[in-house]
Amino acid sequence: MKVLWAALVVALLAGCWADVEPESPLQGKPEPELEPELEPKRELEQEVEAEAGWQAGQPWELALARFWDYLRWVQTLSDQVQEDMLSNQVTQELTTLMEETMKEIKAYRAELEEQLGPMASETQARVAKELQAAQARLRSDMEDVRTRLTQYRGEVQAMLGQSTEELRARFASHMRKLRKRVLRDAEDLQKRLAVYRAGVREGAERSVSSIRERLWPLLEQARTRHANLATQPLRERVDALGQQLRGRLEEVGSRARSHLDEVREQMEEVQAKMEEQANQMRQQVEAFQARLKSWFEPLVEDMQRQWAGLVEKVQVAVGTSPTTPPLETK
C-alpha cells in the first residue's frame, strides 16, 4: 500500500509541473533605437512612467524606493549645495539606504526559504543560490549609482580643456554601459530561473517513469490474486479494504496537490517580482541618465560661449574678420 501511495503522489507532482514555460518578455526583443532629437523626450517619458509605476509592497521594496527618492531629492538641489554635500553627506546617506535595502532583501529571502521548507534540500539550495546572485547584482548596481555622483563631476572638471564632442561622447558611453549592465542582469536572472524550473520538471518526470516501471508488475500480480479468490466473504473483505485504500489515497493525493499548487504559486510570484524589479531598475537608470544630461548642459554651453569669445578676441587682435566657431554635432 505504501508503494501505491508513493506512485500517486509522484504522478500528481508530474502533473503540477507539466505547464509550458511562457517566453520571457525581455528575451528576443531588442531595444528600439531612437532618433537623436527624440531621445530626450522619450527618456523623460520613461522617467515619469517609472515614478508612477513603482509600487512598493514588501519592506525591501520600500527601502529601495527610499534610495531612489533620496537621489531625486539630491538632484533638485542647487549646484553649490550639491558641491558641498557630495564629498561626505550624500555618500553616507546613500550607503545607509543601500545597507537598509540589502538587510530587507536578506530578511525576505529568509522568509521565502522558510516557506519552501517541505521541498528537497537540493531544491532549497538552488533557490537560495539564485536569490543570492540577484541580491549581489542589485548591490553592485546600487554601489555604482552611489559612486557616479562623486566621480562624474570630477571627470567633467578635468575635461574643461577638451572638446565638447569628446565630453558628450564619454557621457553617452558611460550611461549606455550602465543601462546594458542592468538589462544583462535581468536577462541572466530570467535564464537561470527558466533552467531551474525545467530541471525540476524533468526530474519529476523521470521519477514517475521509474516508479511506474517498478510498480506495474506488482499491480498485475495484485489483479491476478484478486481474480483467483474463491470465496465470496474473502472478496467482500478485499473490496472493503480496496475502498478504504482508495479513500486514503484520495485524501493523501488531495493534500499533496494542494501543497504542490501552493509551492508553484510561490515560485511564480518570486519570478514575477524579480522580473518587475529588473524592469523598474532599467527605467529608473534611463531616467537618471536624462537628469544628468540636463544637469551638465549649462556647463557645455558656457564652454562654447567662452571658446567663441576667445576666438573672436584672437581674430580681432590679428586684424582678421571673425569667423563662425565650429558647431557641435548632436
UniProtKB/Swiss-Prot annotation:
Residues 21-43 are annotated as: Disordered. Heparin binds at L178, R179, K180, R181, G242, Q243, Q244, L245, R246, G247, R248, L249. GO terms for molecular function: cholesterol transfer activity; heparin binding; phosphatidylcholine-sterol O-acyltransferase activator activity; phospholipid binding. Residues 1-18 form the signal peptide. Its main location: secreted. The keyword Hydrolase does not apply. Coiled coil: none annotated. Residues 174-184 are annotated as: LDL and other lipoprotein receptors binding. It holds the Pfam family Apolipoprotein. One of its GO terms (cellular component) is extracellular exosome. InterPro entries: ApoA_E, Apolipoprotein_A1/A4/E. Residues 226-303 are annotated as: Lipid-binding and lipoprotein association. It is found in: Secreted; Secreted, Extracellular space; Secreted, Extracellular space, Extracellular matrix; Extracellular vesicle. Sequence repeats lie at residues 96-117, 118-139, 140-161, 162-183, 184-205, 206-227, 247-268. The modification Methionine sulfoxide is found at M159. Residues 96-268 are annotated as: 7 X 22 AA approximate tandem repeats. One of its GO terms (biological process) is phospholipid efflux. Residues 291-303 are annotated as: Specificity for association with VLDL. Residues 279-330 are annotated as: Homooligomerization. The modification Phosphoserine is found at S163. APOE exists as multiple glycosylated and sialylated glycoforms within cells and in plasma. The extent of glycosylation and sialylation are tissue and context specific. Glycated in plasma VLDL. Keywords: Chylomicron, Endosome, Extracellular matrix, Glycoprotein, HDL, Heparin-binding, Lipid-binding, Oxidation, Phosphoprotein, Repeat, Secreted, Signal, VLDL. Homotetramer. May interact with ABCA1; functionally associated with ABCA1 in the biogenesis of HDLs. May interact with APP/A4 amyloid-beta peptide; the interaction is extremely stable in vitro but its physiological significance is unclear. May interact with MAPT. May interact with MAP2. In the cerebrospinal fluid, interacts with secreted SORL1. Interacts with PMEL; this allows the loading of PMEL luminal fragment on ILVs to induce fibril nucleation. APOE is an apolipoprotein, a protein associating with lipid particles, that mainly functions in lipoprotein-mediated lipid transport between organs via the plasma and interstitial fluids. APOE is a core component of plasma lipoproteins and is involved in their production, conversion and clearance. Apolipoproteins are amphipathic molecules that interact both with lipids of the lipoprotein particle core and the aqueous environment of the plasma. This is Apolipoprotein E. It comes from Neomonachus schauinslandi (Hawaiian monk seal). The gene is APOE.
